[in-house]
């Protein structure tokens, strides 16, 4: 059992702007794993930080925790137009992940947001909440401990059939996401390469989710695709950030070399993502028991 004092101490690390960002990230993921109101309160306090990357990750973690207690702060962040688009987008996605009917009205309102990534995210989150409310069941062979923005496509479809839906810009983003998560769950080289083709899509939101999924898969065959988008300085920084973190999850020597080159990128979000990704590479290539090591850091153990 984790004590209140321990949770507050980990929250102190997260909210200490003098600590290295990689330490604050590990503290955040420790709080996510612990859960509960005290952890949510500690995470919520950090939304006044000046790092868009950190705030985006705060919202992501609150969504993954699926605790309706977080809806108040997530709604506030979505409404706050002074927050960076990637932060507001992640708040909307987190509201969809929590899946409570109370969010329908606010998501409907912000589906018309002038920021495209925010509007598209609200539309997908709305579809997810409505899908949950419909009571439909689908076999979800998700091998990852993630709450996805959509369920996989219903029924057994081939890679070719799923790829056709996935790359069809006429389909709704929700249905294209469903096909993507089905391709991910197949986890073959053919399905991974099909997913990688999505990095050429016209929607920055879609490309960023593609990169996230490739990071979950951790398949080296996707490295050249992720590298190309990371190295493109005209690419949306939200996409470049997600490509960097995906390379950090794959964690080969090639990934480390690519990330090291961009660890001083002129875009702060990209630079910080490469630093966090290099820390993830270090973890992936070490005997460390877990990445979210805030508790062991508190008592001095490894």
From Swiss-Prot:
<feature type="binding site">
    <location>
        <position position="242"/>
    </location>
    <ligand>
        <name>Fe cation 2</name>
    </ligand>
</feature>
<dbReference type="InterPro" id="IPR027517">
    <property type="entry name" value="Deoxyhypusine_hydroxylase"/>
</dbReference>
<comment type="pathway">
    <text>Protein modification; eIF5A hypusination.</text>
</comment>
<keyword id="KW-0472">Membrane</keyword>
<keyword id="KW-0503">Monooxygenase</keyword>
<dbReference type="InterPro" id="IPR011989">
    <property type="entry name" value="ARM-like"/>
</dbReference>
<dbReference type="InterPro" id="IPR016024">
    <property type="entry name" value="ARM-type_fold"/>
</dbReference>
<feature type="repeat" description="HEAT-like PBS-type 4">
    <location>
        <begin position="175"/>
        <end position="201"/>
    </location>
</feature>
<feature type="binding site">
    <location>
        <position position="90"/>
    </location>
    <ligand>
        <name>Fe cation 1</name>
    </ligand>
</feature>
<feature type="binding site">
    <location>
        <position position="89"/>
    </location>
    <ligand>
        <name>Fe cation 1</name>
    </ligand>
</feature>
<keyword id="KW-0479">Metal-binding</keyword>
<feature type="repeat" description="HEAT-like PBS-type 3">
    <location>
        <begin position="87"/>
        <end position="113"/>
    </location>
</feature>
<dbReference type="GO" id="GO:0042406">
    <property type="term" value="C:extrinsic component of endoplasmic reticulum membrane"/>
</dbReference>
<comment type="function">
    <text>Catalyzes the hydroxylation of the N(6)-(4-aminobutyl)-L-lysine intermediate to form hypusine, an essential post-translational modification only found in mature eIF-5A factor. Essential for organismal viability and plays a role in a wide number of important processes such as cell growth and proliferation, and regulates induction of autophagy and protein synthesis. Has a role in eIF-5A-mediated translational control.</text>
</comment>
<feature type="repeat" description="HEAT-like PBS-type 5">
    <location>
        <begin position="206"/>
        <end position="232"/>
    </location>
</feature>
<dbReference type="GO" id="GO:0008612">
    <property type="term" value="P:peptidyl-lysine modification to peptidyl-hypusine"/>
</dbReference>
<dbReference type="InterPro" id="IPR004155">
    <property type="entry name" value="PBS_lyase_HEAT"/>
</dbReference>
<keyword id="KW-0408">Iron</keyword>
<keyword id="KW-0386">Hypusine biosynthesis</keyword>
<keyword id="KW-0677">Repeat</keyword>
<dbReference type="Pfam" id="PF13646">
    <property type="entry name" value="HEAT_2"/>
</dbReference>
<feature type="binding site">
    <location>
        <position position="208"/>
    </location>
    <ligand>
        <name>Fe cation 2</name>
    </ligand>
</feature>
<keyword id="KW-0256">Endoplasmic reticulum</keyword>
<feature type="binding site">
    <location>
        <position position="57"/>
    </location>
    <ligand>
        <name>Fe cation 1</name>
    </ligand>
</feature>
<dbReference type="GO" id="GO:0019135">
    <property type="term" value="F:deoxyhypusine monooxygenase activity"/>
</dbReference>
<keyword id="KW-0560">Oxidoreductase</keyword>
<feature type="repeat" description="HEAT-like PBS-type 1">
    <location>
        <begin position="23"/>
        <end position="49"/>
    </location>
</feature>
<dbReference type="GO" id="GO:0046872">
    <property type="term" value="F:metal ion binding"/>
</dbReference>
<feature type="repeat" description="HEAT-like PBS-type 6">
    <location>
        <begin position="239"/>
        <end position="265"/>
    </location>
</feature>
<feature type="binding site">
    <location>
        <position position="209"/>
    </location>
    <ligand>
        <name>Fe cation 2</name>
    </ligand>
</feature>
<feature type="repeat" description="HEAT-like PBS-type 2">
    <location>
        <begin position="54"/>
        <end position="80"/>
    </location>
</feature>
<feature type="binding site">
    <location>
        <position position="56"/>
    </location>
    <ligand>
        <name>Fe cation 1</name>
    </ligand>
</feature>
<protein>
    <recommendedName>
        <fullName>Deoxyhypusine hydroxylase</fullName>
        <ecNumber>1.14.99.29</ecNumber>
    </recommendedName>
</protein>
<feature type="binding site">
    <location>
        <position position="241"/>
    </location>
    <ligand>
        <name>Fe cation 2</name>
    </ligand>
</feature>
<comment type="similarity">
    <text>Belongs to the deoxyhypusine hydroxylase family.</text>
</comment>
